[in-house]
Amino acid sequence: MAALDPITPAGGGTWRFPANEPLRLDSGGVIEGLEIAYQTYGQLNADKSNAVLICHALTGDQHVASPHPTTGKPGWWQRLVGPGKPLDPARHFIICSNVIGGCMGSTGPASINPATGKTYGLSFPVITIADMVRAQAMLVSALGVETLFAVVGGSMGGMQVQQWAVDYPERMFSAVVLASASRHSAQNIAFHEVGRQAIMADPDWRGGAYAEHGVRPEKGLAVARMAAHITYLSEPALQRKFGRELQRDGLSWGFDADFQVESYLRHQGSSFVDRFDANSYLYITRAMDYFDIAASHGGVLAKAFTRARNVRFCVLSFSSDWLYPTAENRHLVRALTAAGARAAFAEIESDKGHDAFLLDEPVMDAALEGFLASAERDRGLV
C-alpha cells in the first residue's frame, strides 16, 4: 500500500447527545442537542481494550486517515494511521471526532440554533479545551469504550490529551503529546488575537452574523490563516523552500506577490477559506488561549496530574518549533515526573518547525511506534 493510500473508515457519522444529557460548559453555559461528527477505523476487540482516540489540532477534523470531503485531500495524519503504521486499524480501534465549536459536522457557531432556527453565530457559548474533552468522553462511552488504550494528539490535540489525563485518568492507559504545551503563552495569544482581529475587521463578518446575510469574511479569514501559518514553520524551512526566490522573472515594482513565499502564504489563505468557518476560528483559538492546566490547581502543574500517575506518557518536541518550544515540553515532563507518572521524552531534531508532527519525520515515527509497542505489551494486546 502506498504511503498515502486512503483507508476506509469502519464507521462514523454524527452522534447526537441524548435530550436529557446537555453538555454543561466551563463558562456556565449549556448546549442542548449537541452533535459530534466522528470517524472510526478498525474494530473494537472482544475485551474493548484496543481503542485509540486521536485528537486533532486547530484546523484539523475527524478525517484523520480518509479523504477530506470538501478538498479531496488525503487524511491529515495518513502517514501514521493505516495498515502497517504505528496506529494500525488491524490492531487498534481508532476514533477521531471533530471538536465542538468546529465546522465539520460537530455543533459549532455555524450550526443551527434550535431555539431560533438560525445559525448560532456569536450566540454560541464560549468553549474550552475541557469542554471539548467532556464531549469526547461522552462520545467514547456511546461507542462502548470505557477505557482507551491511548489518547494521541499534536498541538491543540496535545492539549486535549493533557486534559484527558487530568479529567479522566482512569479512562486511559497511555497518552501521547506531540508539539504541545500545558498552557498558551503570551506570544501565542498575541498571534491568535491578530488573526481574530483580521476576521472581525472584514466588513463581511457582520458581527458574526454573516450567514444571515449570505456572505463570508473570506479576506479576513485568509489573513488570519496566513499569520498563523508562519508560526507553524521555521526560518530555516522557509529559507530552504523559498529563500528570496521571485515568483516571476523580475520585480513587479508594485504590491503583487513578487516573492515565492508571498505567493505561498496567499495560497494557504485562499485555500483555507474553502474548508473552514471564520467564527469557528474565533471560538477554537479562544479555547486554546484559555488553556492553562495548572490554573485550577493552584498554579502547580504537577498537582494537576496527581491522579494520572498510572498513565504512561510519551512527550515529543521538535528542535525548531518556536510555537511550542522544547522548554515548554520539558516543563510538562518534569511536572509529570513530579506527579509520579511514567513519562518518556524526546526532542526531535528537525528544521520543519511546529508542523513537523504532521510531516515526514522518521525519528518521530520510530519513537511513537516504539512507545505504543511497549504500551501494547504492558496492556496485554500482544
From Swiss-Prot:
EC number: 2.3.1.31
Pathways per UniProt: Amino-acid biosynthesis; L-methionine biosynthesis via de novo pathway; O-acetyl-L-homoserine from L-homoserine: step 1/1
Reactions mediated catalytically: L-homoserine + acetyl-CoA = O-acetyl-L-homoserine + CoA
Alphabetical list of InterPro entries matching this protein: AB_hydrolase_1, AB_hydrolase_fold, HAT_MetX-like
Keywords: Acyltransferase, Amino-acid biosynthesis, Cytoplasm, Methionine biosynthesis, Transferase
Record-given protein name: Homoserine O-acetyltransferase
Gene3D superfamilies: 1.10.1740.110, alpha/beta hydrolase (3.40.50.1820)
Gene behind this protein: metXA
